[in-house]
From Swiss-Prot:
<dbReference type="GO" id="GO:0005829">
    <property type="term" value="C:cytosol"/>
</dbReference>
<dbReference type="InterPro" id="IPR049428">
    <property type="entry name" value="RecA-like_N"/>
</dbReference>
<dbReference type="InterPro" id="IPR020584">
    <property type="entry name" value="DNA_recomb/repair_RecA_CS"/>
</dbReference>
<dbReference type="InterPro" id="IPR020587">
    <property type="entry name" value="RecA_monomer-monomer_interface"/>
</dbReference>
<dbReference type="InterPro" id="IPR049261">
    <property type="entry name" value="RecA-like_C"/>
</dbReference>
<dbReference type="Pfam" id="PF00154">
    <property type="entry name" value="RecA"/>
</dbReference>
<dbReference type="InterPro" id="IPR023400">
    <property type="entry name" value="RecA_C_sf"/>
</dbReference>
<keyword id="KW-0547">Nucleotide-binding</keyword>
<keyword id="KW-0238">DNA-binding</keyword>
<keyword id="KW-0067">ATP-binding</keyword>
<feature type="compositionally biased region" description="Basic and acidic residues">
    <location>
        <begin position="335"/>
        <end position="352"/>
    </location>
</feature>
<comment type="function">
    <text>Can catalyze the hydrolysis of ATP in the presence of single-stranded DNA, the ATP-dependent uptake of single-stranded DNA by duplex DNA, and the ATP-dependent hybridization of homologous single-stranded DNAs. It interacts with LexA causing its activation and leading to its autocatalytic cleavage.</text>
</comment>
<dbReference type="Pfam" id="PF21096">
    <property type="entry name" value="RecA_C"/>
</dbReference>
<dbReference type="InterPro" id="IPR020588">
    <property type="entry name" value="RecA_ATP-bd"/>
</dbReference>
<feature type="binding site">
    <location>
        <begin position="67"/>
        <end position="74"/>
    </location>
    <ligand>
        <name>ATP</name>
    </ligand>
</feature>
<dbReference type="InterPro" id="IPR013765">
    <property type="entry name" value="DNA_recomb/repair_RecA"/>
</dbReference>
<dbReference type="GO" id="GO:0003684">
    <property type="term" value="F:damaged DNA binding"/>
</dbReference>
Length: 352
């Protein structure tokens, strides 16, 4: 083995050669610079933001949202788009299913006039458009709805009944190899919405799997399993769904956390309902019988009245959301993190 000084000299020479050939900073020591906090895009549900561990969806990463039909996958993605736009970001929606409802998106807070929308004919076209948009460096978030609808050109141009084994999986693998690096460089969040299929002949374990092969499972930094668990009713009328989201994979924080939130028909995720649920759970909002109170003031009798009160008082809703995140250590800004010796060094900022 070479002497320690010789090894150090050889390493410095190699680093100098790499910097000369590939540019300054191509290789660096992790301790040379202070790591920046993780930038996030809020999901619209405080419970889901907390379950993700960093206060939202990480920027510059691949996210997969999957689940059964009508479980709320697109709703979660559209809320993230709306939050990115509110922070001044530019969003794109690759509508491979040709099923985007602009009116519903607008009700969720999406600026549909500014939203970039593409309805591609083939999977190759969809992913090429995405690659060009991300490569521009101007995009903040892009949604692909859905992976199952990214049909390879050969399958579209072929006859019904032709076998096209593995074409979509190869297409996804090639695209993700190419796109992942650009997403990180441009800090663009890519949300892939995916559907469930059942594997034939599975007797042990879950037969469910997602479409598009295994590449997306590997490249995704966060995978969220979204399920509808209950129908919300007012009298005899159905007004929404209770939804459960499980963080199946998380490279940014501990995985397997579960969040529950309400999706109201025509309105999307109930932000105010989530604040009340989390506030009660963590002792910030008091519940006595059917009454909800905060700091001695009554919010309302029953969940619906309390929701309405917070909707009419957005400043109070924002204050409660901030208190919940502070108590749970999620969404702490760098200045706050530095002032607390016991606080973890890596914390998410609240947006951009």
């Amino acid at each position: 083995m070479a002497a320690a000084p010789d090894r150090a000299k050889a390493l410095e020479a190699a680093l100098a050669q790499i910097d000369k050939q590939f540019g300054k900073g191509s290789v660096m020591r992790l301790g040379d610079e202070v790591r920046a906090p993780i930038e996030v895009i809020p999901t619209g549900s405080i419970a889901l933001d907390v379950a993700l561990g960093i206060g939202g969806l990480p920027r510059g990463r691949v996210i997969e949202i999957y689940g059964p039909e009508s479980s709320g996958k697109t709703t979660v993605a559209l809320h993230a788009v709306a939050n990115a736009q509110r922070a001044g970001g530019i969003a794109a929606f690759i509508d491979a299913e040709h099923a985007l409802d602009p009116d519903y998106a607008a009700k969720l807070g999406v600026d549909t006039d500014a939203l970039l929308v593409s309805q591609p004919d083939t999977g190759e076209q969809a992913l090429e458009i995405m690659d060009m948009l991300v490569g521009s460096g101007s995009l903040d978030i892009v949604v692909i709805d859905s992976v199952a609808a990214l049909v390879p050109r050969a399958e579209i141009e072929g006859d019904m009944g032709d076998s096209h084994v593995g074409l979509q999986a190869r297409l996804m693998s090639q695209a993700l190899r190419k796109i992942t690096g650009r997403l990180s460089q441009t800090k663009t969040t890519a949300i892939f919405i995916n559907q469930l299929r059942e594997k034939i002949g599975v007797f042990f374990g879950s037969p469910e799997t997602t479409t598009g092969g295994k590449a997306l499972k590997f490249y995704a930094s966060v995978r969220i399993d979204v399920r509808r668990i209950q129908t919300l009713k007012e009298g005899a009328d159905s007004v929404g769904n209770r939804t459960k989201a499980k963080i199946v994979k998380n490279k940014m924080a501990p995985p397997f956390k579960i969040a529950e939130f309400d999706i109201i028909y025509g309105q999307g995720i109930s932000r105010e309902g989530g604040i009340i649920d989390m506030g009660v759970e963590h002792g910030i909002i008091k519940k006595s019988g059917s009454w909800f109170t905060y700091d001695g003031d009554q919010l309302g009798q029953g969940m619906e009245n309390s929701r309405r009160f917070l909707r009419d008082n957005p400043e109070l809703a924002a204050e409660l959301e901030r208190l919940i995140k502070e108590k749970l250590g999620v969404g702490v800004k760098p200045a706050d993190a530095e002032s607390k010796e016991d606080s973890p060094k890596l914390k998410a900022v609240d947006g951009f």
